[in-house]
From Swiss-Prot:
Higher taxonomy: Eukaryota, Fungi, Dikarya, Ascomycota, Pezizomycotina
Pfam families in alphabetical order: Exportin-T, Xpo1
Name the record gives this protein: Exportin-T
tRNA-binding recorded as keyword: yes
Entry keyword annotation includes Transport: yes
A molecular-function term among this protein's GO annotations: small GTPase binding
Amino acid sequence: MEEQVANAIEIASNPSADPALKTQAFDFVNQLRSDPSGWQVCLSLFTQTPQRSGIVRHVALEVVNSAAQGGLIDLQALAYVKDGLLAYLRQVYGQDAGASDPPNIQNKIAQTITFLFSALYASGWESFFDDLLGLTQKSPSSTTRDNASGIIFYLRVINSIHDEIGDVLVSRSRNEQDKANALKDLIRQRDMQKITSSWQQILSEWRDGNDVIVEMCLKAVGSWVSWIDIGLVVNQTMLDLLFQQLGRAQKEDLRQGEEKVRDAAVDVFTEIIGKKMKPEDKIDMIIFLNLDTIVSQLSNSPPLHGNRFTFKYDTDLAETVAKLVNITVIDIVRALEQEGVSTECKEKANGLLQAFLPHILRYFSDEYDEVCSTVIPCVSDLLTYLRRIAKVNPALASQHSSILLPILKAIIAKMRYDETSSWGEEDEQTDEAEFQELRKRLGILQQMIASINEQLYMEVVSEMVATTFENLRQSGSQMDWRDLDLALHEMFLFGDLAVKAGSLYTKGNPNNQAAERLIEMMLRMVESDIRSFTHPATQLQYTEICVRYSSFFHHHTHLIPGVLENFLQLVHHPIKKVKTRSWYLFQRLVKQLRQYVGNVAQTVVEALGDLLVIRAELPSEVSEGDEMSSEDHELADAIFNSQLYLFEAVGIICSTPTISPDKQVLYVQAVLNPIFLDMEKNLEAAKSQDERAILQIHHDIMALGTLARGFSDWMPGTNTPATLPAPEVSAAFNQVAEATLVALESLKSSFNVRTAARFAFSRLIGVLGSRILPQLPRWIDGLLTQTSSRDEMALFLRLLDQVIFGFKGEIFSILDTLLTPFLQRVFSGIADPTTGTDDEIQLAELKREYLNFLLAVLNNDLGAVIISERNQPIFETVISTIEHFSKDIDDFTTAKMAFSVLSKMSSSWGGPDVIAEASNGTPPSQAPLPGFGQFMITRFSPLCWALPSTPSFNSKDAQAKQVLAEAGGLQRTIYAKTGMEYLTYLRDRELPGMGMGGELIEEFVGALSRLDLKGFRQFFPVCLSNFHILSI
């Protein structure tokens, strides 16, 4: 059997084995894992002599582990496994044989031994640590820990046990945690003294003999210290041994591996300080350990001081010491801010804070961002504490200047690009992203300082920015771009203090002192020569700042032409990233300065002309499966989407009130005519399904719609102050609508073209107004095709709601003409089968938009169009769809809307209220529909009971209650319109037909006649819940 198992493992792991045979071998080994007797064979395979191959032994022990952890080995058998493995360990590790197992096998054995510890230490293997410690000596008569291989294995198990029961980062169930806690208690009670004594012996006897042993031992001390008696580690003997290892930091040159030992020694102190204690005890511990001196010595050691700013600088040690500083300062601050801490302790903590401030600054200002990031948490805690103090006593803010000033200066210095950075390089993107993330974290700290001492923050930043611009004036393009970028970045952040409600001004005056300072900075920046901003990073910062503080230009209009000229240079920038970002920012700027840019409209349109040429790009022609093709396509899309901002900017500039309508038409046609020619040129090829031509048409239509969006902010039915453009301009955009419709009618099978056309339609409403109404049938015919998705239909319905709301006085006849064919397409979309979750979501959305459309028609006094002679044939379909939706147990939102539509129909067509205290006190907006009263009673009223009669309906569900409230509102509306006729129907037919008893009927009818609309909406859900009507 053993040979069979060994052969199977060998075959399964052999890459050149026959695939069929390999599959059989895999299956056999996997069956072995679940075989209750499989582990016995594997244990024998692992321990036998001579040793099997490494892979056989590894897999064999893995099977034993799997069986033990899977519960296939009972306690008695686990003792057998323990005896077998212990005998093996004594044979291989206990005699300094010199040929111990490779690390992967050692780790696997340690894993098994750790599991056996968890299962048997409480009962069955009480001598666990004694047995393992026996491996650390060459013979029972040895007086020292002199067996290197045994010591390494012992420490490996010690560290594994911590991972199993002591590591707080490991997620455990409640039972697992209870077991871990019980095992820790047992160790403390039985063996902790001898374990810590063994660490001292090992560190003492091997301090210069074996770096691997010393490092593993230090890691064990550092990990176990969090859950053992601190006195077992913090005692003079152990501290002397730790200080000896720290001494390695003072060496100029370390042999390979010594760095790990030195860093592990520092980590022990970090773990000691990280141990949970009362604030008083922690502060005394920091003082007792003399951590200030330890950190000073480490900071002044050759790797961190002598080698700083050289290639030999030891960043690993710097980060390790920074962790120690960070955890220490966090605890110092905690003692200062915690309630109930004695005054004496706080005085000690304050002294320690002053002592550690230089250490904070040393590592916070480290040139390596990883080191700086390590101490950000303690800086954040310190500033949070100082901010709390300043809020309680603002006078203390100035007293803390000695702490805040150096931190603020360090923050600003760390926000500067370092000398090795290369902005914009492809291979530097990760570094750039990490640096920007660091800037964000530093920016938060800077905001905290500003909230503690605003005056200090303003003075430091103002002085830095002013000095930078003075240096720029003197040295011009010779200035280091990093310094200018830093000043501009600080200007951008400064707005958090200066800008209120999007502006630097309130009623024409600067918001505050910060706004005054920022206005001074803006003057310096804008009056600087843009040619001095030689680096793309500073050029982008310039544009971002101009946009963010555009309110500055409202009060310094004489500077606008120069700034626009600078922007027109940057929108032509050779670097794509700068150019495309500038397109967006240019649009933002002119939108905010619209009233001041009319006099340069012609100049701008001419300057942008070459950038308004549209070139659609298909994904690169590359071999199938090349991953770059999708990236190329995304890049091309991103560039075109950015180009659209230029079209919007042109629309904004050309539509300023200071430009006469004829000039507006002239400028806009200069942009439109090339696009019209391009569409005409590509249309025939697009009809032949040429992909690039279709994409070109899509881009052209999107550009036309975006130009319209820039030209007019006006939307029908909104309260925006904008108005429709002049008639001449609207006439010009009527050509845009016509060109779009011609393309749409020819290419309506293209999803992309329909998408672009729908976008253009929504934007053309704002420039055409009611001129667009006669074209509605053509838009509907093009946008709602046989291939249109439900999502497209829902989006177009939403647009139609807006049109109806905006043009309700002019749309009746057109709506009357198009309603039937339009709704038939919607019904077709609703009826199509769904094939997945996305389809179901789109269907639900289409239903809701359909109901919203009906509500828009009814709410805008256009309900007559639904019952007109032309649309009479679809009236029954409209009603039946609403009835169906009102009974949808799986979509309460739609059901609720369906009842809202039925209520609106009832109030619109049911005639005047015949009951005092009418449904809502408003007269019907439309003439009553003959016979509709009886129709409401017989068709609408039963629907109110249909949904709650469904077996799976839960009347206590929050959404269900809302549906029932809406259904109750419908019943009250029917009663308001029909009075006693409805009550009689309920008494004699509807309620008895449901099996409701006479007493309940009278209570229900009485409530309906007595309560108002609001009252009955509340009553109906309660009625169903209390009377259990569903089961009657």
